[in-house]
């Protein structure tokens, strides 16, 4: 039996951006649903975070979600199982008030998706799988008990485990220890958007790009085989972020093909700019010959030297969070620096979801 796996779909991402909504459905319309139909896959497990914002979703995004995603699952007669993720819940201490129960309904009112607010063992073609939703203060004891006693070799959930990559160069240092799932042959999880697989725990990664931290990180969905207990990765060919390094020392940008930059968020990194007129002509082409969602030009790094961060820290840092964490470590203050780092990280992630102009 083949089971399609989705996770961290985050419908309504980037403040209900229409740009990202259209980009998401390119994947569903051209990759996901056609693959399920061609391969006669009739079961879907969603491993949490089906929507993006915990408090609300706008009418247009909700309309598209119902008619272009949920109704299509029903029309294709896909047996759908949805785990509650942390972005799906209104309160942080319970899964009971969630977007899934409100939005994920079937047109006939009968063949509703299976929704998991609490852990449950479900049999798929003779294979028992423990379905583990987001663990919160209300269900924690029950979840941990099920992780220790459930009659299942495979676990699928929405876990916050330490030691795994949340995004590029950012490793989770908090959360539950991996040992809580050590008794399972394999654990598949949503929550972190970058693929992580240590051989026993597999964070599947998101299906598409949502922030610049997803850039150059292969996206797609997975198909689980209950007989072999292996997963197959189906690539999503669509991207929305693209970088262009400008160096006119040995390249003529008047002849540069900009087709691949259409309908993209672009970072234009200026390495060497000797011909200012050619650079301006390139900008003119990017703005007028194609449709660019956003163009950021990066060419002045002088402001970095004016910070209080030492040169060795700045040179050794791989990303924004690493830079900030190293800076916090150098602060001569009597504070809980680990707690401060967590607060900064949460603010950084929230800032990445700032509104995108449609």
List each model region and its residues.
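Core catalytic region of metal-dependent phosphoesterases/phosphodiesterases
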Residues: 9, 13-120, 180-184
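Accessory, non-catalytic peripheral segments of nucleic-acid enzymes
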Residues: 226-358
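Divalent metal-coordination and catalytic microenvironments
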Residues: 8, 44, 49, 65, ...
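Short, conserved loop/helix-junction motifs that constitute active-site signature segments
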Residues: 73-76, 146-150, 178-183, 259-261
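Conserved catalytic scaffold of divalent metal-dependent phosphoesterases
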Residues: 88-179
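Active-site environment of divalent metal-dependent phosphoester hydrolases
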Residues: 10-14, 52-55, 82-93, 122, ...
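Conserved beta-sheet core of the metallophosphoesterase superfamily
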Residues: 167-233
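Extreme N-terminal starter segment of soluble prokaryotic enzymes
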Residues: 1-4
């Amino acid at each position: 039996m083949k089971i399609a796996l989705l996770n961290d779909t985050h419908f309504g991402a980037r403040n209900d951006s229409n740009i990202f909504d259209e980009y998401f459905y390119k994947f569903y319309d051209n990759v996901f649903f056609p693959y399920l139909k061609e391969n006669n896959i009739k079961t879907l497990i969603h491993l949490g975070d089906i929507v993006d914002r915990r408090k609300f979703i706008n009418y247009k995004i909700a309309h598209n979600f119902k008619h272009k995603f949920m109704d299509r699952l029903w029309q294709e007669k896909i047996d759908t199982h949805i785990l509650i993720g942390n972005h799906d819940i209104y309160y942080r201490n319970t899964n009971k008030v969630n977007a899934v129960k409100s939005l994920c309904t079937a047109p006939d009112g009968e063949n509703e998706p299976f929704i998991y607010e609490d852990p449950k063992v479900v049999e798929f073609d003779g294979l028992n799988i423990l379905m583990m939703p987001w663990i919160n203060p209300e269900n924690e004891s029950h979840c941990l008990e099920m992780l220790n006693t459930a009659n299942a070799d495979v676990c699928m959930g929405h876990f916050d485990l330490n030691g795994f990559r949340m995004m590029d160069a950012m490793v989770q240092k908090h959360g539950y220890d991996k040992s809580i799932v050590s008794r399972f042959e394999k654990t598949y999880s949503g929550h972190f958007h970058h693929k992580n697989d240590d051989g026993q725990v597999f964070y599947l990664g998101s299906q598409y790009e949502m922030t610049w931290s997803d850039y150059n990180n292969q996206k797609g969905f997975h198909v689980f085989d209950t007989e072999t207990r292996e997963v197959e990765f189906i690539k999503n060919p669509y991207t929305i972020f693209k970088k262009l390094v400008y160096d006119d020392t040995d390249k003529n940008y008047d002849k540069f093909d900009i087709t691949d930059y259409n309908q993209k968020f672009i970072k234009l990194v200026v390495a060497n700019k000797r011909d200012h007129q050619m650079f301006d002509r390139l900008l003119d082409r990017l703005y007028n010959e194609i449709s660019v969602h956003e163009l950021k030009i990066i060419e002045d790094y002088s402001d970095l030297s004016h910070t209080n961060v030492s040169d060795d820290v700045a040179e050794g840092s791989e990303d924004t969070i690493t830079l900030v964490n190293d800076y916090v470590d150098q602060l001569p203050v009597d504070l809980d620096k680990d707690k401060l780092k967590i607060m900064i990280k949460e603010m950084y992630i929230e800032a990445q979801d700032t509104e995108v102009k449609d």
